[in-house]
């Protein structure tokens, strides 16, 4: 990324872009609370990350880089990890505070799902550090735990009438999914959690995209105009702010990584809010970066297995997946890849909101 006079989308420009957009939103929705929540959340995350990553470093909670990854990443070894703590703990505290003022089963469900995935991510990171290699929980163990939590969340959400088979496309258009809504919810929760986790492979990529997506989700919820859902819009803006504050120290070159503690949980929180607010259609658009990252891995693995079975030698579609590594091996600088992914994500937010308003 160029330094000096540049049009690059840096951390500072991304921050002010979101702030300006939030000011516009505050004017449109007549609520200064929106901008206040975002700024306060950003400041909280910024401060606790600034001092927290030093504590994590002293505790030797350091990242192990997988040997199969790009060789350029080997110099990231021993970077403090598990920084997602500084995003998720304030978020959980916020939910507890909100629950004191808002009598909503949905807030409790969101808290349950967030803290459960947080525990999975924390355990995965801890085992990875303890084993001194980039391998914590086994993939089948992690998926089983995620699936169990997702099923419990869906059952309780359904019993509390938060799951509606009529997926809202726009204010005037609903799509009846019938019982298919349940696997959709499962894929949204588990799939998005793992998709954000896969995206967290470059400095600032997952944190920046998460900040943008939560911003878009918050805006979509406000556009719905349902008073009982407004609180989830405010919560989404708060999470966007928390991710931005963390991004200050996670951007290239990263002083701290969020780890699975952060990425798995952020994806789960994003999926949970989308389920509780019936925001599937918009989520599918604004989460395009996360979905693309996950699909690139699925395509790569499937194509390799099929070609190996047919030709006795597996072939690859991409140089390496997730797809951000493909661009790295193409010779594009890490910070440039992240910058371009942020830009694409912002365009997806605009597209999602425009479609929401005009369909």
Swiss-Prot record:
Keywords: Cell cycle, Cell division, Cell inner membrane, Cell membrane, Cell shape, Cell wall biogenesis/degradation, Magnesium, Membrane, Metal-binding, Peptidoglycan synthesis, Transferase, Transmembrane, Transmembrane helix. PROSITE patterns: MRAY_1, MRAY_2. Its cofactor is Mg(2+). It is a multi-pass membrane protein. It comes from Prochlorococcus marinus subsp. pastoris (strain CCMP1986 / NIES-2087 / MED4). This is Phospho-N-acetylmuramoyl-pentapeptide-transferase. It is an enzyme of class 2 (transferase). Belongs to the glycosyltransferase 4 family. MraY subfamily. It catalyses: UDP-N-acetyl-alpha-D-muramoyl-L-alanyl-gamma-D-glutamyl-meso-2,6-diaminopimeloyl-D-alanyl-D-alanine + di-trans,octa-cis-undecaprenyl phosphate = di-trans,octa-cis-undecaprenyl diphospho-N-acetyl-alpha-D-muramoyl-L-alanyl-D-glutamyl-meso-2,6-diaminopimeloyl-D-alanyl-D-alanine + UMP. Catalyzes the initial step of the lipid cycle reactions in the biosynthesis of the cell wall peptidoglycan: transfers peptidoglycan precursor phospho-MurNAc-pentapeptide from UDP-MurNAc-pentapeptide onto the lipid carrier undecaprenyl phosphate, yielding undecaprenyl-pyrophosphoryl-MurNAc-pentapeptide, known as lipid I. Its main location: membrane. One of its GO terms (cellular component) is plasma membrane. Its EC number is 2.7.8.13. The gene is mraY. Signal peptide: none annotated. It is found in: Cell inner membrane. Pathway: Cell wall biogenesis; peptidoglycan biosynthesis. The chain crosses the membrane at residues 7-27, 28-48, 82-102, 103-123, 147-167, 179-199, 203-223, 229-249, 256-276, 337-357. InterPro entries: Glycosyl_transferase_4, PNAcMuramoyl-5peptid_Trfase, PNAcMuramoyl-5peptid_Trfase_CS.
């Amino acid at each position: 990324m160029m330094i000096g006079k540049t049009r690059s989308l840096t951390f500072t420009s991304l921050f002010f872009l979101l702030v300006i957009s939030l000011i516009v939103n505050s004017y449109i929705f007549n609520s200064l609370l929106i901008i206040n929540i975002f700024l306060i959340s950003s400041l909280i995350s910024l401060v606790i990350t600034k001092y927290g990553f030093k504590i994590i470093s002293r505790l030797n909670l350091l990242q192990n880089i997988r040997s199969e990854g790009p060789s350029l990443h080997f110099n990231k070894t021993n970077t403090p990890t598990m920084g997602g703590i500084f995003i998720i703990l304030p978020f959980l505290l916020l939910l507890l505070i909100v629950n004191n003022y808002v009598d909503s089963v949905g807030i409790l469900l969101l808290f349950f799902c967030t803290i459960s995935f947080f525990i999975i991510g924390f355990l995965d990171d801890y085992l990875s550090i303890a084993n001194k290699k980039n391998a914590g929980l086994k993939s089948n163990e992690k998926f089983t735990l995620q699936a169990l939590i997702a099923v419990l969340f869906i059952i309780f959400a359904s019993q509390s009438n938060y799951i509606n088979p009529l997926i809202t496309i726009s204010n005037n258009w609903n799509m009846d999914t019938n019982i298919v809504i349940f696997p959709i919810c499962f894929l949204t929760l588990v799939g998005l959690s793992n998709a954000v986790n896969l995206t967290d492979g470059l400095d600032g990529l997952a944190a920046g995209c998460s900040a943008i997506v939560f911003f878009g989700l918050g805006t979509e919820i406000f556009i719905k105009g349902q008073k009982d859902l407004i609180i989830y819009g405010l919560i989404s803006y708060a999470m966007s702010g928390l991710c931005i504050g963390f991004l200050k120290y996670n951007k290239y070159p990263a002083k701290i990584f969020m780890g699975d503690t952060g990425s798995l949980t952020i994806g789960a929180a994003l999926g949970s809010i989308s389920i509780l607010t019936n925001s599937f259609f918009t989520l599918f658009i604004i989460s395009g970066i996360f979905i693309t990252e996950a699909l690139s891995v699925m395509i790569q693995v499937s194509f390799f297995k099929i070609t190996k079975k047919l030709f006795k030698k597996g072939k690859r579609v991409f140089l390496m997946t997730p797809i951000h590594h493909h661009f790295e091996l193409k010779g594009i600088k890490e910070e440039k890849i992240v910058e371009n992914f942020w830009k694409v994500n912002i365009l997806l937010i605009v597209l999602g909101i425009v479609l929401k308003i005009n369909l």
